[in-house]
From Swiss-Prot:
Organism in which the protein naturally occurs: Saccharolobus solfataricus (strain ATCC 35092 / DSM 1617 / JCM 11322 / P2) (Sulfolobus solfataricus)
Influence of pH: Optimum pH is 7-9.
InterPro entries linked: CRISPR-ass_Csa1, PDDEXK-like_dom_sf
Name of the protein: CRISPR-associated exonuclease Csa1
GO biological process entries: defense response to virus
Keyword annotations: 4Fe-4S, Antiviral defense, Exonuclease, Hydrolase, Iron, Iron-sulfur, Manganese, Metal-binding, Nuclease
Function, in words: CRISPR (clustered regularly interspaced short palindromic repeat) is an adaptive immune system that provides protection against mobile genetic elements (viruses, transposable elements and conjugative plasmids). CRISPR clusters contain sequences complementary to antecedent mobile elements and target invading nucleic acids. CRISPR clusters are transcribed and processed into CRISPR RNA (crRNA). A ssDNA exonuclease that has both 5' to 3' and 3' to 5' activity, yielding 5'-OH and 3'-phosphate groups. Has Mn(2+)-dependent endonuclease activity on circular ssDNA.
Amino acid sequence: MFFTHSDMLLLSKRIKKLPKNVDEELRGWNWSEPPVYTRSLSQVSISEMVYCSTLRNVYLKVKGFRGEIGRQILQGSLIHTIYAIGIEAIKRFIYSRESIDGSTLRTLMGDEFYSLLKDLREEEGIYAKVLWDHITNIYSAELDRVRSKFTNLTRDSLVSQVVPFYVEFPVDGSLLGLTNLRVDAFIPHLPLIAEMKTGKYRYTHELSLAGYALAIESQYEIPIDFGYLCYVTVTEKEVKNNCKLIPISDSLRSEFLDMRDKAQDIMDKGVDPGIAKDCESDCMFYKVCHP
């Protein structure tokens, strides 16, 4: 998730070696034709379709239930927030400072973090600092590398070389019956979508990549053949990444569309799909389903 120019080149080489055989009927730009087309006027959020195997959380939300936000969800939200703010700060400082180098960037990032620290609890601050320093170290070194290789770069070109991706990339999902979306990271040069997860692996995380790919295809009419799924763990000492390149295959696209149709059906008809057999205690609605 902390992409550099070298990372981008390695991913590009991997992608070139993999097959890209996607049925045109399953491209997002075919949103006006089945199976991508949806008759429903309801818009469903991709994030609401990844936690419950029966999608009962969608039903409960329609009925007005509010789930409990547990520790794991809060920690995941913190990591996502610090990640997005940190990457944005790197870009902002490069844009705002002429002839900035890695050492200056480290100083500025340190000052920026301590201005954020006042809004965090002590435990949150520990994990946030580890992640913030991780981001700072990577892109301070990358800034020095780019400056040593290129001269007379515009600030915009410098930013694009140091941080070659967007965070919280907005996507309009309305043509697919989805809400407005935000992709954790988007590398336009490849193109590649990336999602950061902080819990354990779920197959539905791969399905969500298919949803984002379809939505981008519907809006921009460019093919998205791969996604990057990264499980990020932040401890008190380090940041660990476990990332996997995911082909956005026909089967993955079809499964996502089936899941979307089911979610919309639940929203439109208000039919309870029943309690899942694989409920997890950290689910927001666990106490609703298991009082």
